[in-house]
Regions:
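N-terminal secretory signal peptides that target proteins for export/translocation
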Residues: 1-14
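Bacterial N-terminal signal peptides
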Residues: 13-28
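Sec/Tat signal peptide C-region and signal peptidase I cleavage site
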Residues: 30-32
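Extracytoplasmic copper-binding redox domains, predominantly the cupredoxin/blue-copper superfamily
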Residues: 34-290
Length: 290
């Protein structure tokens, strides 16, 4: 082969080597540039996940417990009568289940000599409105619970006018006139009260209800079976108070089969699990036990 051809082939070989090297280098650059973009996307996803998770901490059920129990009346209802024009009547506030002796309308609340943590589930209730309605010759509900700062709404659904009277201990008294068919009236209750406050009607004296005002949501009213429940209490020592309109503070009771003295209705408990069963509290007459 002539030398000119050998030289020409050598030049072509060198050119192809250079082109291959450039192509390989370009591929290497493209390949190495992609991982940083993928890494950025991965970091962004992780950051977004972290922000979403930490935006509002989840409530741990391990920090809150629910307390429930039952109150029964084993005394004689016939001994609880009240004089009324035209004769006598049984105490309308003393409602006892005929079969299981459950005592209705026992007010149970957390006594608060110090601040207590409130579960976020109660945030919505704090801005709600509590209502007492005159209907069918009654004030309903018989016991209404209200948080300090909430609004109280008074409604007259009866055929005649009413003049509700609420003589608070810590708040200004209320005595509005509500003619039949009048629009409801609304008031804001600002301060907690020590005990349930009676709501009466100066026109119809036997119309009665009670209003319990506290600066926390941990209040309950026993149902027709005498059962009460306080949900989402913070862990720790608490003091409950028990009160009924026919007896005042429940003091001389039988608690789970044993005589017990509850000073001013106080019951000490430790909330240390998700469910605390107080058991059964029996009341006979609220007189000192032998």
């Amino acid at each position: 082969m002539p030398r000119c051809w050998i030289g020409y082939l050598g030049v072509l070989s060198v050119r192809w080597s250079l082109i291959s090297a450039v192509v390989l280098w370009a591929g290497a650059v493209t390949s190495s540039a992609a991982p940083p973009r993928d890494a950025e996307a991965s970091v962004a996803r992780q950051l977004q996940s972290t922000l979403t998770t930490n935006a509002k901490p989840a409530i741990s059920s391990e920090n809150w417990g629910t307390v429930h129990g039952r109150v029964t009346f084993v005394g004689d209802q016939k001994s609880h009568i009240r004089p009324r024009r035209g004769g006598v009547q049984a105490d309308p506030g003393l409602v006892v289940h005929r079969a299981n002796r459950g005592l209705k309308n026992v007010v149970v609340w957390v006594y608060r000599p110090r601040p207590i943590a409130v579960h976020p589930a109660y945030d919505v209730d704090a801005t709600g409105t509590a209502t007492i309605t005159r209907w069918n010759r009654q004030l309903l509900p018989r016991i209404q619970t209200v948080r300090a700062g909430q609004a109280l709404r008074l409604v007259n659904r009866g055929p005649a006018g009413m003049a509700p009277m609420i003589n608070f201990l810590k708040n200004s008294p209320l005595g509005p006139a509500l003619p039949a068919g009048a629009a409801a009236m609304q008031f804001r209750i600002q301060r907690a009260e020590m005990i349930p406050i009676r709501v009466s009607d100066s026109i119809v004296p036997w119309l009665t209800a009670y209003l319990m005002v506290q600066d926390h949501p941990y209040m309950a009213v026993s149902d027709a079976n005498g059962v009460f429940e306080l949900a989402n209490l913070p862990y720790g020592q608490i003091t409950l108070k028990l009160w009924h309109e026919s007896f005042g503070y429940l003091q001389h009771v039988t608690w789970n089969g044993q005589p017990a003295e509850l000073t001013r209705g106080k019951l000490e408990l430790s909330v240390d699990s998700s469910i605390i069963d107080v058991g059964k509290i029996e009341l006979e007459s609220n007189s000192p036990l032998p």
